């Protein structure tokens, strides 16, 4: 189980402290990163890719992405792309699917359990989803003009 945290707010001390309340969900490593004014945190329990390459968020010039999940058909989905993925993480394929097929089709293609946040850096748009059953929890809250999304309610 990993912990993910996102907010459209800057990385203020209170925001960082909130994100760190999820650290028990990822005992292997933690990462905090601001991308285009959006704050991402990831607490990792390494399962599929034990190397540092599997650390999130995954960030390119097109997206930033964090995910707590297990994508059972990730190897088959990776074959849809002629790119070199930076890791062996089963979640890394998801943002590429979103960019190519859109969120609705991507969700129908995924086999597994997941909760994620995707920042489209081109359109400055946030997309977030979880598996239909809700095996991987995901909570969202707003305050004024700020959006926050986390693996556990206590981080909000």
Segments predicted by a language model, with ranges:
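Cysteine-centered catalytic environments shared across enzyme families
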Residues: 1-156
């Amino acid at each position: 189980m990993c912990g993910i945290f996102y907010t459209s707010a800057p990385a203020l001390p209170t925001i960082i402290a909130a994100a760190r309340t999820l650290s028990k969900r990822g005992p292997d490593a933690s990462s905090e990163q601001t991308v285009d004014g959006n704050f991402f945190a990831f607490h990792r329990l390494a399962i599929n890719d034990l190397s540092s390459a599997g650390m999130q968020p995954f960030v390119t010039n097109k997206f930033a992405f964090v995910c707590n999940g297990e994508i059972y058909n990730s190897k088959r989905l990776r074959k849809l792309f002629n790119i070199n993925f930076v890791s062996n993480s089963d979640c890394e394929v998801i943002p590429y699917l979103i960019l190519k097929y859109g969120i609705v089709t991507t969700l129908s293609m995924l086999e597994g359990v997941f909760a994620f946040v995707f920042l489209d850096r081109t359109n400055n748009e946030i997309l977030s989803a979880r598996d239909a059953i809700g095996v991987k929890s995901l909570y969202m809250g707003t305050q004024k003009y700020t959006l926050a999304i986390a693996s556990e309610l206590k981080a909000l």
